């Protein structure tokens, strides 16, 4: 098999920048007569003549706003240019930028800079080549002089410079157009024929992993679960497939099931159902022997009961890595490259988090005045790729980890794996407490510090600050202890206060047998928060142009009925008080489990129309899970209704799986924007939590199969052949949006540790990198780029890795539990003679068995077909089955 092929020219971009994109993204090597040889140029897009601009993209800062496109140059047929539209000039010259990153300047080399630029209004442009981040050293900048542009007149610049500094791999070619440089907005600036030439530099030729025709879970499949692969083919007829082992021996074969056009990927696909093959092994792969293609195969994969055993611990390790206020060190970090000093403990250059002030009063918060005070808010988890800490995002994340433990405790496995003391590799191991609760406590202790005291402001005492983060965004390639930005407490919100009440109530009941003092304090503060929220039910974290900081995400939420319900559920289950019981039973969300958010009204506007059950902004499903899981005083009929609602939601997602070519439980959103939303992978993970509970409550293995399908999509069976998890699969996530794990920014920063999941496809084009790299008509499932600058598709967060840890642990541990009334998934029911799996034994089974023995390319249930129970399926079984059908034998198996 031809597993790899050589690519050069601009496709080298996939290796140089360590990314993988749909093939439509790449420009080919240009042959411009105006520019030097492409192979000696440090830039990967120079002419824009193919309608593409990546890796050129834009940047907005300090009030700047812009847009961009590749357009035809008037009067010049066949010539295109990069057009930047300046919409708002912002406060500074760097408020509006267009730039090309991923440049290494070598000491002693001489470079030739060339570009043509023009505008439709008189303005100035400051061009520079220098560092992407602090201290922003500039190696070329036209001697600090901006270029003056006259309307309609092209300016061509050509200059030489020598790199007299040490070699620097953190460089970018940038044009600043904001602030004092700008004309009256809006206006256009055009860029074309841009080059950075070094005769001593040669673009490398690298090998790029092609996308195979057969898409599989690149890690593997559980033996007992249903197993599907997806074949990309426009054939309308079944295709022959073969499953081979690591010794290249055919162990199973059959014919594909044509499915036609898959809407979300725009691929024509078939399915391979090899569910009945349960033999454990490593290195299996598929081949399509009748398909004349260099890619008529799959990546290798395993079939094993332990494929998630390491993954679940890697997923949980993410939270230790994201701790604030503590050094990340060996032996807990997993490798020296991932160690770092403690961040935000009040040591310069940090401006936090031991004495963080409230946000200064301004127009943004005119309706939400707050007094000036400072708080020690050390600890907690950094939310994502930045250094912000957010209560609402941390709330659903810490709930998920504690729910993992609570379910394990109720199911009788809390003394195993990550749940037991000493099971996780964290500093608190062997302290007498369950490790996963220790990790959750790190966040809960931070939450406590975010609550307003009577002394600080009696008018809002008990309320909780929404978030704490930097005043402005910092650049990638910055460790937490290096962050120089001022940090502020953003105003309190009802949503944050109710997240606090819910999770501290949950924490109280889980800690009461281990640390009663801590548990009592959690409950006391949770009840204070509840009363404060009742007093201030409408302090919303609204979205405003500046609500991101701009040094943090807004996490806006203007509907909190779901948070009130969730908090009441947790407080009721912990205390049994009628106050909370009455509140939750009268909530419009009582016992609700959304299948598609917003259907019953009240969901956060950002989530309405999205397939899924809960997010940081839509939380009623969390409360319903708690009521269904934990013993409480509700009527038994209500608890059963909650469990039924969980199963009903899961059933709708199983229907989606059967409709989707790549068998995933979400479909395109049914809101005004459609497509796939930010964090689409997290919607799937949260759905899988609900599927897990549906299996717990019903014993129906179809929900386990749905979880396996979801994992297969995330681990490679998708339109991009992409595993969205670091360290797992043939094409794993490599370049998440993170300020530390960012080797694309500089080689001095490490690749990410294993077990981290990316947000995944987002067809709403919400960052400049994805907008520059992927065409707007790209199918939603393919709107993704594994690039450190793409925060809207490649972000990593605590509230996404938490469900990833939950799901991997569940699938790894499922063999430890048999649900009430259920069947042990390791021992599925065998109906001897039912070869075709229709629940009956008749002549059609004999025909199927005969065709299987003759290798006619069909799949059968081999367990059922082994009618003499000798562990083999052969002509002896066929003879016995015929006798049984003719009633010459009364019972199967017959030996």
Swiss-Prot record:
Q: Which GO terms describe its cellular component?
A: extracellular space
| Protein name per the record | Cellulose 1,4-beta-cellobiosidase
Organism, as annotated: Acetivibrio thermocellus (Hungateiclostridium thermocellum)
Domain of life of the organism encoding this protein: Bacteria
Localisation? Secreted
- Locate the CBM-cenC domain: which residues? 40-199
Family, similarity comment? Belongs to the glycosyl hydrolase 9 (cellulase E) family.
Q: Which residue ranges does the record annotate as region Linker?
A: 199-240
Q: How does activity depend on pH?
A: Optimum pH is 6.0.
Gene assigned in the entry: celK
């Amino acid at each position: 098999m031809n597993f790899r092929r050589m690519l050069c020219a601009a496709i080298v971009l996939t290796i140089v920048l360590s990314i993988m994109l749909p093939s439509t993204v790449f420009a080919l090597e240009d042959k411009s007569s105006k520019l030097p040889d492409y192979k000696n140029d440090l830039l990967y897009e120079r002419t824009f003549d193919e309608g593409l601009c990546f890796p050129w993209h834009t940047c907005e800062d300090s009030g700047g706003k812009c847009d961009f496109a590749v357009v035809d140059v008037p009067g010049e047929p066949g010539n295109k240019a990069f057009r930047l539209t300046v919409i708002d000039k912002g406060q500074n010259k760097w408020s509006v930028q267009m730039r090309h990153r991923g440049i290494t300047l070598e000491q002693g080399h001489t470079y030739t800079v060339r570009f043509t630029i023009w505008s439709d209004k008189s303005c100035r442009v400051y061009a520079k080549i220098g560092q992407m981040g602090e201290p922003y050293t500039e190696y070329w900048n036209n001697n600090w002089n901006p270029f003056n542009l006259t309307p309609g007149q092209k300016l061509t610049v050509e200059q030489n410079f020598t790199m007299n500094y040490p070699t620097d791999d953190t460089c970018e070619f940038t044009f600043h157009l904001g602030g004092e440089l700008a004309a009256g907005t809006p206006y256009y600036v055009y860029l074309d024929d841009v080059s950075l030439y070094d005769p001593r530099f040669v673009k490398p030729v690298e090998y790029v992993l092609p996308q195979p025709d057969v898409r599989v879970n690149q890690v593997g499949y559980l033996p007992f679960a249903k197993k599907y692969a997806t074949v990309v083919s426009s054939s309308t007829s079944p295709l022959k497939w073969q499953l081979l082992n690591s010794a290249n021996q055919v162990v199973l074969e059959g014919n594909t099931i044509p499915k036609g056009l898959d809407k979300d990927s725009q691929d024509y696909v078939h399915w391979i159902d090899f569910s009945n093959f349960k033999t454990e092994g490593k290195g299996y792969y598929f081949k399509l022997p009748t398909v004349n293609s260099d890619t008529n195969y799959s990546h290798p994969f395993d079939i094993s009961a332990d494929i998630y055993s390491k993954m679940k611990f890697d997923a949980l390790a993410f939270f230790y890595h994201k701790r604030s206020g503590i050094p990340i060190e060996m032996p807990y970090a997993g490798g020296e490259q991932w160690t770092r000093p403690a961040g935000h403990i009040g040591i310069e250059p940090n401006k936090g988090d031991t004495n963080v002030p409230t946000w200064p009063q301004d127009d943004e918060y005119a309706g939400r005045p707050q007094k000036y005070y400072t708080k020690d808010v050390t600890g907690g988890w950094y939310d994502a790729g930045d250094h912000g800490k957010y209560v609402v995002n941390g709330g659903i994340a810490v709930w998920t980890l504690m729910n993992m433990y609570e379910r394990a405790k109720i199911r009788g496995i809390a003394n195993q794996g990550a749940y037991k003391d000493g099971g996780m590799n964290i500093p608190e191991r062997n302290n007498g407490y369950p490790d996963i609760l220790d990790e959750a406590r790190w966040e809960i202790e931070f939450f406590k510090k975010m609550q307003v005291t009577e002394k600080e402001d009696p008018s809002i005492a008990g309320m909780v600050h929404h978030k704490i983060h930097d005043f402005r965004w910092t650049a990638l390639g910055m460790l937490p202890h290096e962050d120089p930005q001022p940090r502020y407490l953003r105003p309190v919100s009802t949503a944050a206060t109710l997240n606090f009440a819910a999770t501290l109530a949950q924490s109280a009941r889980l800690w009461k047998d281990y640390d009663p003092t801590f548990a009592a304090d959690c409950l006391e503060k949770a009840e204070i928060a509840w009363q404060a929220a009742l007093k201030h039910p409408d302090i919303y974290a609204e979205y405003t142009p500046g609500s991101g900081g701009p040094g943090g995400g807004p996490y806006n939420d203007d509907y909190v009925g779901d948070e009130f319900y969730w908090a009441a559920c947790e407080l009721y289950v912990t205390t049994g008080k009628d106050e909370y019981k009455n509140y939750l039973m009268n909530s419009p969300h009582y016992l609700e489990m959304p299948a598609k958010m917003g259907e019953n009204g009240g969901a956060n506007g950002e989530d309405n129309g999205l397939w899924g059950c809960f997010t940081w902004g839509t939380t009623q499903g969390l409360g319903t899970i708690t009521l269904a899981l934990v013993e409480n005083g509700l009527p038994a009929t209500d608890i059963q209704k909650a469990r039924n609602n969980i199963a009903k939601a899961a059933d709708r997602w199983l229907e989606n799986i059967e409709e989707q070519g790549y068998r995933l439980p979400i479909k395109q959103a049914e809101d005004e924007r459609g497509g796939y939303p930010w964090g689409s992978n997290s919607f799937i993970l949260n759905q899988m939590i609900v599927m897990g509970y549906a299996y717990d409550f019903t014993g129906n293995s179809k929900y386990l199969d749905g979880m396996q399908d979801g994992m297969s999509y995330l681990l490679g069976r998708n339109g991009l052949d992409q595993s969205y998890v670091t360290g797992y699969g043939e094409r794993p996530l490599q370049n998440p949006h993170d300020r530390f794990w960012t080797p694309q920014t500089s080689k001095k920063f490490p690749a990410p540790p294993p077990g981290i999941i990316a947000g995944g496809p987002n067809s709403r084009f919400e960052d400049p990198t994805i907008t520059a790299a992927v065409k707007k008509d790209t199918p939603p499932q393919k709107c993704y780029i594994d690039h450190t600058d793409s925060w809207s598709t490649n972000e990593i967060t605590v509230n996404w890795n938490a469900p990833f840890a939950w799901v991997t642990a569940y699938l790894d541990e499922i063999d430890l539990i048999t649900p009430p009334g259920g069947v042990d998934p390791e021992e599925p029911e065998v109906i001897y003679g039912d070869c075709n799996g229709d629940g009956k034994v008749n002549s059609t089974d004999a025909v199927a068995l005969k065709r299987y023995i003759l290798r006619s390319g069909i799949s059968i249930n081999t367990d059922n077909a082994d009618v003499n129970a000798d562990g083999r399926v052969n002509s002896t079984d066929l003879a016995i089955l015929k006798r049984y059908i003719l009633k010459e034998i009364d019972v199967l198996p017959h030996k």
